[in-house]
Swiss-Prot record:
PTM annotation (Phosphoserine): residues: 38, 41
Top EC class of this enzyme: hydrolase
Species this chain originates from: Bos taurus (Bovine)
Binding site for ATP: 89-96
Protein name as annotated: Spliceosome RNA helicase DDX39B
Gene: DDX39B
InterPro entries hit by this protein: DEAD/DEAH_box_helicase_dom, Helicase_ATP-bd, Helicase_C-like, P-loop_NTPase, RNA_helicase_DEAD_Q_motif
Amino acid sequence: MAENDVDNELLDYEDDEVETAAGGDGAEAPAKKDVKGSYVSIHSSGFRDFLLKPELLRAIVDCGFEHPSEVQHECIPQAILGMDVLCQAKSGMGKTAVFVLATLQQLEPVTGQVSVLVMCHTRELAFQISKEYERFSKYMPSVKVAVFFGGLSIKKDEEVLKKNCPHIVVGTPGRILALARNKSLNLKHIKHFILDECDKMLEQLDMRRDVQEIFRMTPHEKQVMMFSATLSKEIRPVCRKFMQDPMEIFVDDETKLTLHGLQQYYVKLKDNEKNRKLFDLLDVLEFNQVVIFVKSVQRCIALAQLLVEQNFPAIAIHRGMPQEERLSRYQQFKDFQRRILVATNLFGRGMDIERVNIAFNYDMPEDSDTYLHRVARAGRFGTKGLAITFVSDENDAKILNDVQDRFEVNISELPDEIDISSYIEQTR
């Protein structure tokens, strides 16, 4: 797959509107108390110690959270004081909840004014972050949240801004910029500017330009927060240019970004043997939900169809389908209506489904970053999971070696039998 195609696949980034949205890293799935790990329930303090609004604490209790994760423990006390934050922490650690709770805590809603702007690089992620805001603002009825991204009519967005102006806007840079340029979206009252999966937006020059133009439309005095699972040393200075003396938090070194509780294996086979092997594994493995990653839209459609024909309850998500259809299918999978999802990289970054406990790389990801974000779909927030990667040629083997070197992890060949308790939580 050409590099250009990969970018299109990942970002679905279009020239006329920068319409991409980043991912909620999921303040979902409460930590299981019996799981040992560096970040699960390691702090005896609860969310109450942050002195959050009672309305927020009620929503947190409703979501089933008791103890903040390490990244939440490190970031929230400073973030709620309005400090700029630059944070890297591995997938599944609840980064989304940091900025959602910090901005809701500080928000003083003013009718007709947008106070919070959150941008991310994929539409699905924008949608998910907006849902997190709705979840945590459950007992704050005056707070309005809206999500704007390309692929849907801009007229509807303009209508929302005119008739029911939100206090919190989540969106992708292209659509946000289009709305700001045509004066539908007024950014003069922004108090909190957040980039989620910031490296994806700032590494690409065209998207970075859009973010910079939007940034210049906001007031000088504001809080800036940026989050990502991967922040290279090269991109950090770029992030800092947007900030004033930020608090920098890097939870776990880059080489330790692999996930606690996630079993990782590979299977060596020919390309034409993948289907049979996949069906065999789906037959013998125990799973709640599974995500299968493929490299193209065509393979995504064909494999999903094949799985259904073999009586596996599969659903596909890819960039070739209309936006409404994509979001509807994402919601179906999240609501457990289907247990198997076949997806392109479009789904790979930041999307949070807490029941997924197995991720398959049917096709090898193009680099170690993509590998991390794909396998992070299983084993979210300290729960157990299994990642199985199909290796069918020398290039696949090279990428797998890169992954092992970079993250200092040993990925071994899939054994004939796997202990079920190593990749699925046992119900008590």
